[in-house]
């Protein structure tokens, strides 16, 4: 199974491995990946969680607390940590989510849904406590993406590009934030 990951998804996996190694954890777990996803500044995971009505900061704090509680080895180890069974199951589920959504690359949204959908794992338990299910996350994806599909490695940066780089003049007019422009000095020629 050849998986193609977006740049942000690759970064999250790399950060998860580095985090596990730095903490002396023997395995990279769903907790490490979820923490890496939530720490991404330009990522969409926090927006996805917010769309479900949950508090991404609170969930992130609970994930970090759970990470601290993981067993760690002391001393210097030169081997990098292995992926846990839960992480492998979550990544497999993420690939299924990618295919189900008609996308070409595994993105950070797929990873988060994969983690929550591949319960039981510590992250899924935290999300369940906050009433966030895989179905709720799936329903939030179109809103966060603005209807876009993941067709390139940099797809997450392109979501809602129109909203990022333009001004909705109609919305500004409704809010009374536009100055009315009068064209009464112009006369149209009549024949």
Regions found by a protein language model. Give the residues of each.
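Short "domain-exit" segments at the C-terminal end of structured domains
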Residues: 187-191
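Histone-fold recognition with a strong bias for associated Lys/Arg-rich disordered tails
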Residues: 1-186
């Amino acid at each position: 199974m050849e998986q193609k990951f977006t740049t942000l998804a690759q970064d999250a996996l790399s950060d998860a491995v580095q985090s596990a190694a730095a903490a002396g954890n023997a395995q990279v777990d769903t907790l490490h990946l979820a923490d890496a996803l939530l720490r991404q500044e330009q990522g969409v995971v926090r927006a996805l969680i917010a769309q479900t009505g949950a508090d991404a900061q609170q969930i992130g704090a609970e994930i970090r607390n759970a990470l601290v509680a993981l067993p760690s080895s002391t001393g210097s180890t030169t081997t990098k940590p292995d992926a846990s069974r839960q992480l492998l199951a979550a990544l497999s589920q993420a690939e299924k989510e990618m295919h189900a959504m008609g996308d070409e690359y595994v993105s950070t949204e797929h990873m988060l849904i994969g983690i929550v959908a591949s319960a039981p794992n510590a992250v899924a338990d935290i999300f369940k406590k906050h009433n966030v299910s895989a179905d709720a996350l799936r329903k939030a994806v179109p809103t966060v993406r603005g209807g876009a599909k993941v067709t390139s490695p940099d797809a997450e940066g392109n979501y809602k590009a129109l909203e990022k780089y333009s001004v909705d003049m109609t919305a500004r007019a409704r809010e009374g934030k536009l100055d009315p422009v009068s064209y009464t000095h112009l006369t149209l020629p009549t024949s």
